[in-house]
Curated annotation (Swiss-Prot):
Enzyme Commission code: 4.3.3.6, 3.5.1.2
Presence of the UniProt keyword Hydrolase in the record: yes
Name this polypeptide is given: Pyridoxal 5'-phosphate synthase subunit PdxT
Binding residue positions for L-glutamine: 52-54, 116, 145-146
């Protein structure tokens, strides 16, 4: 099994570590590749788009000709996990909590609408225990950093993680077939359950 991590920005090496740890725990002979060129997208079984700054990642992915090929691969069925900025890139609709509609180049492959910086800027980062459908009943310690929220979903997309925030129910994790979008950063914990879920339930399905 070969899983790529888009390597332009964000928690790239944290995801590499968590994938290797997950492979070990699952007894899988797997390889993790950092992807920065179009040719590195071939022969992958899955890819993670890490957090960071979504506009920067999108622009770099477009300049290196990775964006279009990655879009094609995902549409063809390549399993993908988008984390924070990665979830923004997957979304078909994106607005910013402060500036409104954004014009950044997106993959636009998942039937979700995302609001950037939904919970505020850096000072409003927080951690929260959440229970995720399809995982197990044990809470997952979710780390939110300038996080987006999934404000709308349609088609085959289903929410798998919902939190209460300011008296409202907010979707922070969703899945649509081969696509997994997360508002929070699972790579910033020692808990590999989400990475293992991506490997076992989405890639190996």
């Amino acid at each position: 099994m070969r899983i790529g991590v888009l390597g332009f920005q964000g928690g790239v090496y944290e995801h590499v570590y968590m994938l290797k740890k997950s492979f070990h725990e699952l007894g899988i002979n797997g390889k993790v590749l950092i992807v920065k060129k179009p040719q590195q997208l071939h022969d992958l079984d899955g890819i993670i788009i890490p957090g960071g700054e979504s506009t920067t990642i999108s622009i770099l992915a477009r300049k290196t000709n990775v964006l279009e090929l990655l879009r094609e691969k995902i549409v063809e069925g390549l399993p993908v996990m988008g984390v924070c900025a990665g979830a923004i890139m997957l979304a078909k609709e994106v607005v910013d909590q402060v500036v409104g509609e954004t014009k950044q180049p997106l993959l636009g492959v998942m039937d979700i609408a995302v609001t950037r910086n939904y919970f505020g800027r850096q000072r409003e980062s927080f951690e929260l225990d959440i229970v995720l459908d399809e995982l197990d009943d044990k809470p997952f310690r979710a780390v939110f950093i300038r996080a987006p929220a999934i404000t709308k979903y349609w088609g085959a997309t289903k929410p798998i993680g919902i939190i209460n925030y300011n008296g409202e129910k907010v979707v922070v994790a969703a899945r649509e077939n081969n696509k997994l979008a997360l508002s929070f950063h699972p790579e910033l914990t020692s808990d590999t359950r989400i990475h293992r879920y991506f490997i076992e339930k989405i890639i190996k399905k």
